[in-house]
């Protein structure tokens, strides 16, 4: 499939450089199998010139730098990138990479292999090979081929045109109603939560066969409730909601091929980072990418795995 890789930058050139350096170790980037697009948000604090300098100095091949003339905010920036690459440019799938994730050299090979595998199932949505799984390298090595359902953060993932076409009506409605003509940080949280509650009144759809069709005990609503004061209202939350309502499952490898280092940022502090379990990440370097995959729904004790949106 024709594949685009989208990176996202706003300030923090040191973060962006660390991410970009790791992206350059992926074979698909160096041999031109994928096209890399750098989306740089604008406005005060954007440091676009510094980010451009990082990109040019890195030597990592790229197709285009998309520098926004104003500050779109995270929501419009991510929705816009998906629109431009999947709707306008016609890519079959895209990989989204934020500026605070470090990739193993096996990252893209593993992710695209998983995407190919997942495309045989009509009820799989996004796929990712970043996860939080504690354990030593020796203890995790046997499980590189295992995948599981997830509701974790959308730090980096692969989205196909097929899935985007299914979920984009909800995202475009959210964008039009709540993100235009105002800063993303001042989006109307209560109105968005009302929108989410209205959406959740609809039962999830059932995609046609063939399906992965997980047992009901393994499936968890990312938003079993929408508290008025605390429910997340980000575009990531709406993306997760849209996939749930479409009957699409998010999946991840059990063992991670990337490391999230965003301890400080727009939505994160060291305390939140620890609360989310990110300190339990292992950062192991793998020599080979899995070529076959096996879904697991239970842990080693026979208990159902669970994952909630966080």
Language-model region placement:
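Peripheral/terminal regions associated with large enzymatic or DNA-binding modules
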Residues: 1-97, 101-310
């Amino acid at each position: 499939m024709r594949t685009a890789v989208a990176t996202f930058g706003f300030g923090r050139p040191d973060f962006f450089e660390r991410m970009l350096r790791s992206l350059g170790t992926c074979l698909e980037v160096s041999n031109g199998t994928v096209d890399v697009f750098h989306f740089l948000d604008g406005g005060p604090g954007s440091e676009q010139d510094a980010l451009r300098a990082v990109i040019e100095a890195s030597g990592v091949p790229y197709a285009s730098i998309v520098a926004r003339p104003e500050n779109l905010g995270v929501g419009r920036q991510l929705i816009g990138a998906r629109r431009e690459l999947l709707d306008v440019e016609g890519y079959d799938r895209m990989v989204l990479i934020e500026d605070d994730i470090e990739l193993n050299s096996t990252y893209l090979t593993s992710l695209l292999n998983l995407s190919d595998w997942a495309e045989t199932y009509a009820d799989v949505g996004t796929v990712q090979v970043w996860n939080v799984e504690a354990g030593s390298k020796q203890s995790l090595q046997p499980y590189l081929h295992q995948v599981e359902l997830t509701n974790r953060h959308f730090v980096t993932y692969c989205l196909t045109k097929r899935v985007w076409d299914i979920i984009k009506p909800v995202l475009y409605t959210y964008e039009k109603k709540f993100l235009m003509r105002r800063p993303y940080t001042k989006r109307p949280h209560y109105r968005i939560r009302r929108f989410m509650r209205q959406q959740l009144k609809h039962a999830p759809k059932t995609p046609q066969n063939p399906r992965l069709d997980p047992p009901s005990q393994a499936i968890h609503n990312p938003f079993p409730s929408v508290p008025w004061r605390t429910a997340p209202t980000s575009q990531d939350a709406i993306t997760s909601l849209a996939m749930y309502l479409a009957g699409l499952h998010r999946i991840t490898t059990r063992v991670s091929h990337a490391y999230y280092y965003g301890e400080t940022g727009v939505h994160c502090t060291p305390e939140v980072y620890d609360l989310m379990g990110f300190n339990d990440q292992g950062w192991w370097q793998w020599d080979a990418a899995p070529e076959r995959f096996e879904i697991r729904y239970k842990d080693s004790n026979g208990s159902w795995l669970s994952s909630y949106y966080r």
